[in-house]
Each structure stands twice: as C-alpha cells, then as structure tokens.
Amino acid sequence: MKFVDSASIFVQAGEGGRGCVSFRREKFVPKGGPDGGDGGNGGNVWLRTNSHLTTLLDFKYRKKYLAPRGSHGQGSRKSGRKGADIYIDVPCGTLVRNAATQELLADMTGDGEEVMIARGGHGGRGNQHFATSTNQAPRRSEPGWKGEELQLDMELKLMADVGLVGFPNAGKSTLISVLSAARPKIADYPFTTLVPNLGIVRYEEYKSFVMADIPGIIEGAAEGRGLGLQFLRHIERTKILAVLVSADAEDVEAEYQTLVGELEKFGRGLDEKPRILVVTKMDIAPEDFTLPAPGDEVHVLAISSVAGMGLKELKDELWREVSMRDRPEESSDPEGEGDGGTP
C-alpha cells in the first residue's frame, strides 16, 4: 500500500430543512390555525480515528465529503427528520487544520476518538411560530440554515515510542525486522527505505512498545537534501530516539554528531528528546574498534542484528526509557503536608 502522510479535503455539513406553511384542516373548523412544522437540522461531519488505518491514501481519491440535509417540515406540526451524520475515518496521529487559516482544529491520537468538524445547519421554523394577534393565518416560514463548510489540511504523524534515526544503510530496517514482525525492504544500497515503517516490539510478558523506522537522513537534510527530512515529523511524538551508526563508518562519533546536528537544525523538539547511540554491524567491526564516548550522558550500546549480539541489552534499555516516560509524575508533597491543607 502506498504511504501518504498529507492530504486536503473539503467537508460540508448538511443544510437545515425548510419550515412548512400549513393550516389545520378539521371538520367543522373552517378556519383552522397554522400548524406548519419545523425543518430538521442538517447532518454533522465527524472525524474518527481508526487504529487499522496507517495512511491518508484514501483522501487522494476522494476530496469532498457532504452530509445530508435535514428533511422539510410538514403539516400537523410535524418536524422534519434530522440529516444523518457522516463519519470520516482517519489514522491515529492525524493533525487537522483549517486550510484557510492554518488553525489547528484537532490532534487525534487515541483509537476511536471522535471530533465534530462541521455542524449541520438549523432547520427553518414553520408558520406556526409566526401567528400574532394581528395575523392569525401567517403564510411565512423560514428556509433552513446552511451547514458549516471548510477545507481541511490533514497531516499524519505516526504514533511510536521509539524512533530510529541514522544515515542510509545504518541497519535500521534490519534492526526493526529482527525486533518486531515488521518486514521492511532490506538491501545493500542507500535509501532502501522509502517510507516510514512501524513495528511492535514484544518485551517480556504482556509488554510491548512501538518502534518507527524512517528513511535515512544525510548531511544537509535540514536544507532539503535526501529523503529523511520529509519524514522526520513521524518521530516527533516518540519518547526516545535511537541514533544508529554503523561500526564500519569512517568515524562513528563524527557521524553521530552530524546526525544530532541535523536534528537540531530541524528543531520542533527533536533535538531535546532523550537519545541513545546504537553502534550497529558489530559483526563486521574492525579489530581495533573501540566504542565512542560522545558525552552528554548518552548511553552507548553495541549490537549486531545479524549475529544477535546485544539485542537483549538494547530492548532492556529501550523499555526502561519508554516505561520511565510513561509513568505519571509523582506528587512533590507525598505526605500531604503542603500549605493550606485541612487537617
């Protein structure tokens, strides 16, 4: 399936139904009063997250979503039926903006989350509402109100706990395929990964975390070079970054610093995320290879996805970091002795 992470659609809520002009018809009542019913409200437009969706591809083929109008009012004070609401399913992690103003309307992260994005128009009033002491038989009613309409810009940011960052051929795809059931394309040439991949990493009993592999970034990515920059948004929501550098690199620490520099240039909080340095392909490391010490309290791990070396230690470290950031913050006043308390 083609991966699409941005789309623009037009949505229009339903118009309200017309109010009715009608008069009571009863035997022996030659001049019955007005009894025109109100029109029904138009249908609303909702956005709803669906965890089974992973792309905005559907919106490349369907650009307009229109909710039904409300039914018109009828005689005998019968109101029209409300127009049916429509629901538009989107992947978890979708941001929705008003295309005209770029105002953020919704940031939808949880499965099954629903947001009303356009409200249907009110139904018009029937002539029963316009009778007065001087006009007992009004022939006036109201048309329905128009429903809200707007153009939406949608952007997908994948939901993951761990983001893999590295130069092309650093071993990101191999690692995610070994740790999870994800099966990205793997080959011995640069830019094998052309779209982000998600994998669920199982950890001990009943525990798991989600890992995201994005296309490799290169020096100058912040200025638009390479493929990785356009996909960096997909690791903005992660709790920790694993920066992968191959052990056969000319200078492992220099590559690490280059990658960190690109994250800093991109901004949007990526440079502030906790990170670990993962030195990959240790099975082909030179005999005199030594692990770098980049400082800044960065934990350094050495692994080989092919040989299985260091993978348990890596999973342990990633789980520790993820679970630590999942915990609710502890109260700074555990004894309940803060000022102003009631005994």
Curated annotation (Swiss-Prot):
Keywords: Cytoplasm, GTP-binding, Hydrolase, Magnesium, Metal-binding, Nucleotide-binding. Its cofactor is Mg(2+). Residues 331-343 have a biased composition (Acidic residues). InterPro entries: G_OBG, GTP-bd, GTP-bd_Obg/CgtA, GTP1-OBG_CS, GTP1_OBG_dom, GTP1_OBG_dom_sf, OBG_GTPase, P-loop_NTPase. GTP binds at residues 166-173, 191-195, 213-216, 280-283, 304-306. Its EC number is 3.6.5.-. Residues 129-138 have a biased composition (Polar residues). It is an enzyme of class 3 (hydrolase). Residues 160-323 form the OBG-type G domain. It comes from the Bacteria. Gene3D superfamilies: GTP1/OBG domain, P-loop containing nucleotide triphosphate hydrolases. Residues 121-144, 322-343 are annotated as: Disordered. Residues 1-159 form the Obg domain. It is found in: Cytoplasm. GO terms for cellular component: cytoplasm. NCBIfam families: Obg_CgtA, PRK12297.1, PRK12299.1. Monomer. HAMAP family: GTPase_Obg. An essential GTPase which binds GTP, GDP and possibly (p)ppGpp with moderate affinity, with high nucleotide exchange rates and a fairly low GTP hydrolysis rate. Plays a role in control of the cell cycle, stress response, ribosome biogenesis and in those bacteria that undergo differentiation, in morphogenesis control. Belongs to the TRAFAC class OBG-HflX-like GTPase superfamily. OBG GTPase family. This is GTPase Obg. It comes from Chlorobium luteolum (strain DSM 273 / BCRC 81028 / 2530). The lineage of its organism: Bacteria, Pseudomonadati, Chlorobiota, Chlorobiia, Chlorobiales.
